[in-house]
Amino acid sequence: MYAVLKSFGLKGLNGFPVEVEADISGGMPALSIVGLPDSAVRESGDRVHAALKNLGFKWPDRRITINLAPADVRKTGPVYDLPLLLAVLAASGQLEPPPKDTAFLGELALDGSLRPVSGVLPMALEAAAGGVRALYVPAENAAEAAEACGSEMQVYPAATARQVVDALRGIQPILPTMPVPFDPADAWNQVPDFADVCGQPLARRAMVIAAAGGHNVLLVGAPGTGKSMLARRLPGILPPLTREEAVETTKIYSIAGQMPAGRGLVTARPFRSPHHSASSAALAGGGAQFRPGECSLANCGVLFLDELPEFSRESLEVLRQPLEDGCITVSRAAGSATYPSRFQLVAAMNPCKCGYYGHPTRACTCSPSAVRQYRSRVSGPLLDRIDLCVEMDPVAFDELHGAAPSESSAELRKQVLAARAIQAQRYAAPGYEDVRCNAQLTAGQVRRICRMTPAAEQLLRASYETLGLSARAHDRILRVARTIADLSGKRLLDEDSLLEALQYRAQEKVDLTF
C-alpha cells in the first residue's frame, strides 16, 4: 500500500517542495525514513508512532518505508511530523489520500497536538507559488502563513493532528485564517523619543542624515555622552517598512525561530545589539541548519555595535561583505546559503581604553601607545565603509537643565520622510531598481546622480588629495553630500553640502587612524 503527500522544506531563505511518500509492505515491523533526513527527521518516527496511538489510530504492524523526495536535498527539522503521520494513515487505509493540491506542515507532540515550526512563511510562499490550494499548519503559525495567501490558497490552523484528520474526512471543517491588514505605522510608538536626548546637536544631525540616506554611523565619546541613547532612537525616525521589506524580514526571523507565536508580519524595523563577545559565526550566521546571524536579523533595520574595539578582529571583518554587498553568504560543508543583510550600522566606541582621552575634566590613564593600540583594533577597511563619524563631548549642565526642549522623533521623522520622498522619485527611473536610498548607489550611479557646482568640485578635488582618500571614501562622501542636499531641497551639491559631509569623514580619518 502506497500514499504520497505534499510538504515543504527550507533551503536558505526560500522553501522547496517535498513529497512525503509512505509504503507499507510485508516483512518484520519496522520504520525506515530515507531521503537525506537529519537527526530531527529520523526521530520523527518515534513521535509519529506515539502520537498515532494516543490519537486512537492503529499503527501498522508491517514494514513502513518513508521517502522524502527529492532525495538529494537534505531535510531538516520536525516540520515533516504531520505529513508523515497522515501518509502512514493513508497508506494503511485509515484515511483517504488528501488532494494533490493540499500540503501539510507541523511538529507533533506525543499526545498528537501540533507545535509551531520555524520557517513557515518562506514555505507558505513557495506553496502558494506552486499551486497549493489548502495548507494545514499549527495554529500558532497560522497568522504568519496566512501572509502568503493569494486568491487561490487558504491556510487552515489546527491545534491537533486529530483536527486535521477530521477536516480531511469532512467531519469537522476548519475555518481558514485570513491575513491581518499590514499597518507598520504603530511601530514608531515602540521606540524611545529623540526628545529625551539633551544636547549633542552635531550627533543628532548625523543621525538625521543617516536616517535620510541609509548611511552608517560611528559615535565616539566618553561614557555617559549619550551614544547608546541616540542609537536606540534611530529606528523611530526611519521610514516605515514597506510590505516587501516586512515579508523579507519576517522570512529571516521565521527561519531563525524568533517569530512570536500568533504573529503575522514583522512591522517594526529591527534593532539588534549583540554583545561585544559575539563570535564571527553569531554575526554572520551558520550552524547545521544555516541559521541567520545578527547581520541578517538586522536586515532593513539597525545593527548597533557598542564598544566597537572590544569585538574581535575576526568578528569585525565579517561586516565587510554585508556593508558592501547588502547580503552575506554562509558556507559550510553541507552547502551554502545567502541571506539579505541590508542594515544600517551604528557603532559606538570610547576614545581610549579608560574612556576619558580628551575629556575636559577627567584625566585619561592611558599612555599614547595604549590609545593607539586601542583604536587600531578597528581596521582601516572597516572605517572606510562608515559614512559618518561624530565625536561627542560631555553634556553641559545647562543643556540638562533649563535648555529648550530637543526636537522630537516626530519632528525629525518629517525631515527624513521628505528627503526619502525625493530619493524615491529620483530612483523610480529605469536603471535604479535596486536603489531605495542614497547609501545604496553604486560607483557608476554616484557619478550620474551626485552632480556638483564648480566650486564644490574644486573643494572635493583638494580634499581628495590632502586627506589621501580612497576611491570608496570619495564615493561615500558624495553619497552623504547628496543626502544633505536632499534634506535642504537642493538639486546640485554645493560647497555647504560637501563641507558638512567632509566634516564627518575627515574627523574619522584624522582622529581615529594613527
Functional labels for PLM-detected ranges:
Residues 1-218, 222, 228, 331, ...:
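Peripheral, non-AAA+ core regions of ATP-driven protein-machinery
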Residues 40-45, 60, 67-77, 290, ...:
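Basic, amphipathic alpha-helical bundle interface domains used for macromolecular binding and assembly
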Residues 105, 158, 284, 304-308:
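Hydrophobic residues in beta-strands of the RecA-like P-loop NTPase core, especially within AAA+ ATPase
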Residues 208, 265, 270, 280-303, ...:
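Conserved alpha-helical scaffold flanking the Walker A/P-loop in AAA+ ATPase domains
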Residues 219-260:
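Walker A/P-loop
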Residues 245-279, 286-287, 434-444, 471, ...:
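Conserved inter-motif catalytic segment of the P-loop NTP-binding fold
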Residues 300, 306-307, 318:
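Walker B catalytic acidic pair
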